[in-house]
UniProtKB/Swiss-Prot annotation:
Function: Catalyzes the reduction of arsenate [As(V)] to arsenite [As(III)].
Residues at the active site: 11, 83, 90
CDD domains cross-referenced by the UniProt entry: LMWP_ArsC
Signal peptide per UniProt: none
Stated family: Belongs to the low molecular weight phosphotyrosine protein phosphatase family. Thioredoxin-coupled ArsC subfamily.
Name by which UniProt lists this protein: Arsenate reductase
Record flagged with keyword Mitochondrion: no
Any single biological process term in GO: response to arsenic-containing substance
Disulfide bond annotation, renumbered to this chain: 11-83, 83-90
Keyword terms, alphabetized: Arsenical resistance, Cytoplasm, Disulfide bond, Oxidoreductase, Redox-active center
Ribonucleoprotein keyword on record: no
Reaction catalysis annotation: arsenate + [thioredoxin]-dithiol + H(+) = arsenite + [thioredoxin]-disulfide + H2O
Amino acid sequence: MENKKTIYFLCTGNSCRSQMAEAWGKQFLEDKWNVYSAGIEAHGVNPNAIKAMNEVNIDITNQTSDIIDATILNSADLVVTLCSHADAVCPSTPPHVNRVHWGFDDPAGKEWSEFQRVRDEIGEHIKRFSETGE
């Protein structure tokens, strides 16, 4: 019987950071967590996010850019906002939903090295969370 918790990664456009977080989450957390991502808006998956994750042998070409699903939001065990905009405007969550903010810079429109840096920072944070719960 599967009894996984649900983690929901949110950012503004569900294009870069939350896509990377979903991929890293599936890499490090999938045995204990159902992993989803969404945005305040759906901007499509950024091609550089796909390229950055391919560099670490994680394929996100089949991930979709989605707007926040109220059902997932209200039933998640943990909601993680990845940018200050999502943290500020994310719909309110019920008291039983643990909500935290892990801020990462937006690499969109920046140098390629920013995508790599943000990818690695998100991956390290999620790996640490998988090991320590923090």
